């Protein structure tokens, strides 16, 4: 079982890069990610393959989980951990929230991994007949402990997620795979809860010296094949606690009770978040984090605009010019002076007096006067709009303060 994973410090570093590029949005497009990807100096065809692998949902953009996948692939290529871009994502690098998409893609492309069907050896010495499908409450509680510790976010169990358990059992690898094939008739990469409990029950009995059955009761098989997914994870019953009684010795008196050492090593006293396969981002960047980023950015912008508006209003009140902006009072004054001057020239032209030069075009002066009048009207409209914007900003800030 691979021990590779994306470490927490890597996730935090990737988050800093991602948030600086995304402008508060939950996804990066190709243009936004191009700069940081090309800084790796990998060949364009390599970057294209990395993008295609990381874009698990195929929407042409990278969310944060997919961005982490892309960055880790790039770093492994740059550091020599990988000589070329792999044809598919390794299991440890697949985000758990998108594992079902990868499995569906593999199934459609015919690459779904399947175990070779292993014929049972009826002549295995020392094994007993009489396998019983009945699960005692204590055994079932223990199975649910193990299932809860290793299920993914969709309530399903992968074969490789129980590798540590397999190593703690006195069960050959061929028998473990035979039991998996028995409860997984569709050869899927994961099984549902009913199949998982049956799988653990088979392993328990094999650990106690019973032969693995050849068939499964029809009622159980139908529940395995339907493979209905319960997305309401809160509906999954809490695993029952179990203890070790004085009569918990195995039939041999020497073996450890099924799963005891494994559960003790996990430190399970009930439901746990232990997930040994894949990359789980559930405890890193949540949707609430995105909302916080957006709200902080919006609040900072609103506060900045309010401060600027208050400063401008105070400057206008005191007759000062707003730094970095036009002095509308001065512009208005100059425009009125220009209008007065043009009106005076027009009046002198009509009366034939004053300094009006011979041959000046009366129509030209009229156009100038009209232009100045339009400019003044435009300034008035603009001032009214800016006052409306200021009022809207103040209302938004008051709403933000009330919502805090």
Curated annotation (Swiss-Prot):
- What InterPro entries does the record point to? EF-hand-dom_pair, EF_Hand_1_Ca_BS, EF_hand_dom, EH_dom, End3
Mind listing the UniProt keywords for this protein, alphabetically? Actin-binding, Calcium, Cell membrane, Coiled coil, Cytoplasm, Cytoskeleton, Endocytosis, Endosome, Membrane, Metal-binding, Repeat
SMART domains given in the database record? EFh (SM00054), EH (SM00027)
Q: Which residues bind Ca(2+)?
A: 55, 57, 59, 61, 66
The residue ranges of the EH domain are 10-100, 139-227
Task: Assign the protein's first listed, main location to one coarse class.
Answer: membrane
- Coiled-coil region(s): 280-404
Example of a GO MF term? actin binding
Mind telling me which GO cellular component terms the entry cites? actin cortical patch; endosome membrane; plasma membrane
The record describes the protein's role as:
Component of the PAN1 actin cytoskeleton-regulatory complex required for the internalization of endosomes during actin-coupled endocytosis. The complex links the site of endocytosis to the cell membrane-associated actin cytoskeleton. Mediates uptake of external molecules and vacuolar degradation of plasma membrane proteins. Plays a role in the proper organization of the cell membrane-associated actin cytoskeleton and promotes its destabilization.
Subunit record text: Component of the PAN1 actin cytoskeleton-regulatory complex.
Record-given protein name: Actin cytoskeleton-regulatory complex protein END3
Lineage of producing organism = Eukaryota, Fungi, Dikarya, Ascomycota, Pezizomycotina
